[in-house]
Amino acid sequence: MRIGMVCPYSFDVPGGVQSHVLQLAEVLRDAGHEVSVLAPASPHVKLPDYVVSGGKAVPIPYNGSVARLRFGPATHRKVKKWIAEGDFDVLHIHEPNAPSLSMLALQAAEGPIVATFHTSTTKSLTLSVFQGILRPYHEKIIGRIAVSDLARRWQMEALGSDAVEIPNGVDVASFADAPLLDGYPREGRTVLFLGRYDEPRKGMAVLLAALPKLVARFPDVEILIVGRGDEDELREQAGDLAGHLRFLGQVDDATKASAMRSADVYCAPHLGGESFGIVLVEAMAAGTAVVASDLDAFRRVLADGDAGRLVPVDDADGMAAALIGILEDDQLRAGYVARASERVHRYDWSVVSAQIMRVYETVSGAGIKVQVSGAANRDETAGESV
């Protein structure tokens, strides 16, 4: 099968949707399918040979964060050219609401179209502006996928259409078998934080507020931080406890997996804006206990707290108590890890990709190819105005 995939977010920086798209493409290619991915990327970024750059992206407020997206007249022409030359059996558009390549592809294409909805919020001003323009194009989507019940419910409420729920995928073995980082396991306890720590919704402020109690109980505790941000500023915020922070910075997938395996606990103190919780799944696959904010998305991944400890959102004292409880009780920690290990296999790519392929096969059953829509060709000027 020839599959075209569109990712709206730039490959210049790592992100959950970008990772999902690349991993799905690799799994499908390994299964013998031909895959082409269209995504924003700067000229200096090294891309797999199956990824076509849609051009350099610009930062735009989206989903309570800042996403790097791509749009404009030249981009619209590039999207149409990619569709016309792709001869795709299926076009899989990720985040069709994002004002980027995904929105342009949905406008320009017709035929067997699948869309995956990753987010579950409409907080973006940009999205609210484009929503009225986008509504008619949603009728083109034949197969709808939501990565979580939250994303599915949002689609039903905002767009009036249902979707099949298929979660994000993880290569469970790559996390379970990852080597430890050099110098690990440490004699002291290690708590992992992963994400953009200068983005408020990731909740680093909650973990920092919990740190004094952690240090009082475990004087040699280490907060292992993986992700982007201002190290000097965070050290200043930590004050006298800055010595307990270790920064790895932005790392590749292999190092991330090793960091997961090397920690005693993965802490996810997020404040909101999450529709799934892929990093929790990765920690579960690595055999690392999870302590997370009691967000709806996290609660579903952790089976209402059976596969990991849930803490009220923005509760530093509760986070400290939960982390201390798991760090000082090996049996409790092992129980969470064992139950998480049983649960995590439902997220393995072998399971998830098979579910996605069934959607592809359903929408492409008539043998019609994806092509540039007649409306897009007739109304070039209107299309470029998007």
Swiss-Prot record:
It comes from the Bacteria. Changing R196A: Loss of mannosyltransferase activity. The keyword Transmembrane does not apply. It is a peripheral membrane protein. It is found in: Cell membrane. Its cofactor is Mg(2+). One of its GO terms (cellular component) is plasma membrane. GO terms for biological process: glycolipid biosynthetic process; phosphatidylinositol metabolic process; phospholipid biosynthetic process. GDP-alpha-D-mannose binds at residues 9, 16, 196, 201-202, 251-253, 256, 274-278, 282. Pathway: Phospholipid metabolism; phosphatidylinositol metabolism. Gene3D superfamilies: Glycogen Phosphorylase B (3.40.50.2000). Its main location: membrane. The keyword Glycosyltransferase applies. Changing T126W: No change in the activity. Changing N63A: Loss of mannosyltransferase activity. Changing Q18A: Strong decrease of mannosyltransferase activity. A 1,2-diacyl-sn-glycero-3-phospho-(1D-myo-inositol) binds at Q18, Y62, N63, R68. Changing Y9A: Loss of mannosyltransferase activity. GO terms for molecular function: GDP-Man:Man3GlcNAc2-PP-Dol alpha-1,2-mannosyltransferase activity; phosphatidylinositol alpha-mannosyltransferase activity. The record marks H118 as: Important for catalytic activity. Its EC number is 2.4.1.345. Was identified as a high-confidence drug target. Involved in the biosynthesis of phosphatidyl-myo-inositol mannosides (PIM) which are early precursors in the biosynthesis of lipomannans (LM) and lipoarabinomannans (LAM). Catalyzes the addition of a mannosyl residue from GDP-D-mannose (GDP-Man) to the position 2 of the carrier lipid phosphatidyl-myo-inositol (PI) to generate a phosphatidyl-myo-inositol bearing an alpha-1,2-linked mannose residue (PIM1). In contrary to PimB, the mannosyltransferase PimA is unable to transfer a mannose residue to the position 6 of the phosphatidyl-myo-inositol of PIM1. Belongs to the glycosyltransferase group 1 family. Glycosyltransferase 4 subfamily. This is Phosphatidyl-myo-inositol mannosyltransferase. The gene is pimA.
